[in-house]
From Swiss-Prot:
One of its GO terms (biological process) is regulation of DNA-templated transcription elongation. This is Transcription elongation factor GreA. Necessary for efficient RNA polymerase transcription elongation past template-encoded arresting sites. The arresting sites in DNA have the property of trapping a certain fraction of elongating RNA polymerases that pass through, resulting in locked ternary complexes. Cleavage of the nascent transcript by cleavage factors such as GreA or GreB allows the resumption of elongation from the new 3'terminus. GreA releases sequences of 2 to 3 nucleotides. Pfam families: GreA_GreB, GreA_GreB_N. InterPro entries: GreA/GreB_C_sf, TF_GreA/GreB_CS, Tscrpt_elong_fac_GreA, Tscrpt_elong_fac_GreA/B, Tscrpt_elong_fac_GreA/B_C, Tscrpt_elong_fac_GreA/B_fam, Tscrpt_elong_fac_GreA/B_N, Tscrpt_elong_fac_GreA/B_N_sf. The lineage of its organism: Bacteria, Bacillati, Actinomycetota, Actinomycetes, Mycobacteriales. Residues 11-76 form a coiled coil. PANTHER family: TRANSCRIPTION ELONGATION FACTOR GREA. Keywords: Coiled coil, DNA-binding, Transcription, Transcription regulation. GO terms for molecular function: DNA binding; RNA polymerase binding. Belongs to the GreA/GreB family.
Length: 164
């Protein structure tokens, strides 16, 4: 498995997501009981409570699967050791389209990390921008395509391990 397939998480983020997963799993019997209670109310075709409970169950099961996959593929607390190369877990600074004044600083990681201060944007290594920057060295320019179809050039100014 390569680093771009691995989700880098801080210890705090991992613990928060694990607690959410544990809560959702613990809630399974409650949802099942709710569905059974609603089923006993009669005709299922006209039973809004039953359908709402089934909908909630589906949403919670989808979130459980998402969290399990995320946590199973997580690298916890292992920020890249090296500076100067954009890797998952790096805080990078870039400038756009040869305009050195148009800069942005962000973490290459996952929004699930919930960077606590809220001041640092997070771009997934699977996003167009994050993916374009993976393995870029300081001073290197890369291009990526935005959803509108336009191509944007970005140059890596700095890359440092995240110390959250």
């Amino acid at each position: 498995m390569t680093d771009t397939q691995v989700t880098w998480l801080t210890e705090e983020s991992y613990d928060r997501l694990k607690a959410e997963l544990d809560q959702l799993i613990a809630n399974r019997p409650v949802i099942a009981a709710e569905i059974n209670d609603r089923r006993e109310e009669g005709d299922l075709r006209e039973n809004g409570g039953y359908h709402a409970a089934r909908e909630q169950q589906g949403q919670e099961e989808a979130r459980i699967r998402q969290l399990q996959e995320l946590l199973n593929n997580a690298k916890v607390g292992e920020a890249p050791k090296q500076s100067g190369i954009a890797l998952p877990g790096s805080v990078v600074k870039v400038y756009y389209d040869d305009d050195e004044k148009d800069t942005e600083t962000f973490l290459i990681g996952t929004r699930e990390q919930g960077v606590s201060d809220g001041k640092l944007e997070v771009y997934s290594p699977n996003s167009p921008l994050g993916g374009a920057l993976i393995d870029a060295k300081v001073g290197e320019s890369r291009s990526y395509t935005v959803p509108s179809g336009n191509t944007v050039k970005v140059t890596l100014v700095s890359a440092e391990p995240y110390h959250g």
